[in-house]
């Protein structure tokens, strides 16, 4: 008999969790409190039951080839970066293609999730739901929490002295949808993340003036890179390998140099404060808005008056009408009891950011409580792939006693300052995907690929690390993965080819040639230079009568 799995939430992680359950012959039931699927990607003029929704102008930050489900590419005519409407259309196509909608119970709120009395033997959960005022109870063999990390707005008003005196409008970005109501006003946006940058840029087109306050600064990236290709398509295994083997100081220095080549972040008031961790945001227009004076960068807020803001550097901005906090969200699981509720919000102690460490049975998975240097959608899909195989007993995780001991030890070390708290850091996309798929048995074997299929292996290692790579082998293998990888650049260029133009000759082809072959040629060149230097030393040693046969065998110079 198939195990029953409760999936809470029908957003991007909920949809992939339903599909992963079906792939493993589990029986999913998804509970969604709103009237439609898609989570925050389903735009609404006003929040439904306080749910977070996208603002109208939102455009994706990760290109389509790097942010799709691993066995369901975007259509080739979809733009590389798309509006929320287009992205929701993709989710609809995915749900309809795999027949996921029939497993979703809409307008159903999960009230409680509690362990059954025999949990230590069965791992079962009792889930209480409410639909139109009527409550229902059901027993499930496993639970996947897919409510995301944008439930409860973080509005730290107590951290801002004098804010109770401020007479203007105060709101969190969760309430922001369209800019029309802010026309002609002087606005302060607090917080420089992706949302803060987007909101400030959009408002700068109609506001009298926009001020953007940040404590730490940020590196601002464009969506496009060398040659106009999407920046994310430069995220390769080769680059990831270099970042791991090269000295971290050199990597940081080079990163800073590259960012400042585009524009000097210090001149624009965006540079990272000393001692702070590097933070990157994606925004194509923010530098131009600063350059044109539409947005004024400010330090952190020191004090509020009735209509003015005092900043840490002593400057004062008067006649402020609106303050918008883009200060993020708190993790919230109101349907859990303590201590499970608190443990699940501490993502740093979740085993591989998925499983709570204190459960005797690994039948509860927290899906999507991650920050990545790549697509969250892809990360949640692989979390779900792994979790469903754990539920089925095909993958194992360490005993709860061991996990809890390690979690407590880690928390103690963080409190004592021995190790850093990395809970707010973004995980490296490729490393985390490799880690999860290693558990599944779906991580691509690069050396084997080079032996069996050199063309594919080349694209896998030196090309963009697209999700299709993790469907080449192992459980969940997809027959279309190879073709998807070899045609990913075609789908990238296709939506741009809307006008017939004369074919460019040398510049474009040379650029592509250098991009493809430059790194390998450099490595080979360095090896040749190294071997040449050894050869010259051998010749010199021979001439000086210091020749040793071991030099030829090992290519290692010996002291005379």
Swiss-Prot record:
Pfam families xref list: FMO-like
Domain of life: Eukaryota
Enzyme class: oxidoreductase
Tissue: Detected in liver and kidney (at protein level).
Record keyword Oxidoreductase present: yes
Transmembrane segments: 519-539
Location in or out of the cell: Microsome membrane; Endoplasmic reticulum membrane
InterPro entries linked: FAD/NAD-bd_sf, Flavin_mOase, Flavin_mOase-like, Flavin_mOase_4, FMO-like
Cofactor: FAD
E.C. code: 1.14.13.8
Keyword NADP: yes
Binding-site residues, FAD: 9-13, 32, 40-41
Residues noted as binding NADP(+) in the record, renumbered to the chain: 60-61, 195-198
Gene Ontology molecular function: any one: flavin adenine dinucleotide binding
GO biological process, one term: xenobiotic catabolic process
Entry keyword set: Endoplasmic reticulum, FAD, Flavoprotein, Membrane, Microsome, Monooxygenase, NADP, Oxidoreductase, Transmembrane, Transmembrane helix
Catalytic activity: N,N-dimethylaniline + NADPH + O2 + H(+) = N,N-dimethylaniline N-oxide + NADP(+) + H2O
Cellular-component GO terms for this entry: endoplasmic reticulum membrane
Purpose of the protein: This protein is involved in the oxidative metabolism of a variety of xenobiotics such as drugs and pesticides.
Name assigned to this protein: Dimethylaniline monooxygenase [N-oxide-forming] 4
Organism: Rattus norvegicus (Rat)
Lineage: Eukaryota, Metazoa, Chordata, Craniata, Vertebrata
Gene: Fmo4
């Amino acid at each position: 008999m198939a195990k029953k799995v409760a999936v809470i939430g029908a957003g991007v992680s909920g949809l992939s969790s339903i599909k992963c359950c079906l792939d493993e012959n589990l029986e999913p039931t998804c509970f969604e409190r709103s009237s439609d699927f898609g989570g925050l990607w389903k735009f609404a003029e006003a929040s439904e039951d306080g749910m977070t929704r996208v603002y109208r102008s939102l455009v994706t930050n990760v290109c389509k080839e790097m942010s799709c489900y691993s066995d369901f590419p975007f259509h080739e005519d979809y733009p590389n970066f798309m509006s929320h409407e287009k992205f929701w259309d993709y989710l609809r196509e995915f749900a309809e293609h795999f027949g996921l909608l029939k497993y979703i119970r809409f307008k159903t709120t999960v009230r409680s999730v509690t362990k059954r009395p025999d949990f230590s033997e069965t791992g079962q959960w009792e889930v209480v739901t409410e639909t139109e005022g009527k409550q229902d109870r059901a027993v499930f063999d496993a639970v996947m929490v897919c409510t995301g990390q944008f439930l409860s707005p973080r509005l730290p008003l107590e951290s801002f002295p004098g804010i109770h005196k401020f007479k203007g409008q105060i709101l969190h970005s969760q309430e922001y949808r369209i800019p029309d109501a802010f026309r002609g006003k002087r606005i302060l946006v607090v917080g420089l993340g992706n949302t803060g940058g987007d909101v400030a840029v959009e408002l700068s087109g109609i506001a009298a003036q926009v001020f953007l306050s940040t404590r730490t600064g940020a590196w601002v990236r464009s969506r496009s890179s060398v040659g106009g290709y999407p920046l994310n398509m430069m995220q390769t295994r080769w680059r990831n390998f270099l970042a791991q083997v090269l000295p971290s100081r050199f990597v940081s220095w080079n990163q800073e140099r590259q960012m400042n080549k585009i524009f000097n972040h210090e001149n624009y008031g965006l540079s990272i404060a000393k001692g702070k961790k590097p933070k990157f945001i994606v925004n194509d227009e923010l530098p131009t808005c600063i350059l044109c004076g539409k947005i004024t960068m400010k330090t952190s807020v020191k004090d509020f008056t009735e209509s003015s803001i005092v900043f840490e550097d002593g400057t004062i901005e008067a006649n402020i009408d609106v303050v918008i906090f883009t200060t993020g969200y708190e993790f919230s699981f109101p349907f859990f009891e303590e201590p499970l509720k608190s443990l699940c919000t501490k993502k740093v102690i979740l085993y591989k950011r998925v499983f709570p460490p204190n459960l005797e049975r690994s039948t509860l998975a927290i899906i999507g409580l991650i920050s990545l240097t790549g697509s969250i959608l892809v990360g949640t899909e692989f979390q779900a792939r792994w979790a469903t195989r754990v539920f089925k007993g095909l993958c194992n995780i360490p005993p709860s006693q061991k996990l809890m001991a390690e979690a407590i030890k880690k928390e103690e070390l963080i409190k004592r300052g021995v190790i850093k708290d990395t809970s707010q850091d973004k995980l490296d996309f490729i490393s985390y995907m490799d880690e999860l798929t290693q558990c599944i048995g779906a991580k691509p074997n690069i050396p084997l690929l080079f032996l069996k299929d050199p063309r594919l292996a080349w694209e896998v290692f030196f090309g963009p690390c697209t999700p299709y790579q993790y469907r080449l082998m192992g459980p969940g293998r997809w027959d279309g993965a190879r073709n998807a990888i070899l045609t990913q650049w075609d789908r990238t260029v296709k939506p741009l080819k809307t006008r017939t133009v004369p074919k460019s000759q040398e510049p474009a082809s040379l650029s592509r040639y250098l991009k493809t072959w430059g790194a390998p040629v450099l490595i080979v060149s360095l090896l040749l230079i190294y071997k040449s230097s050894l050869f010259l030393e051998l010749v010199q040693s021979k001439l000086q009568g210091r020749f040793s046969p071991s030099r030829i065998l090992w290519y290692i110079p010996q002291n005379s």
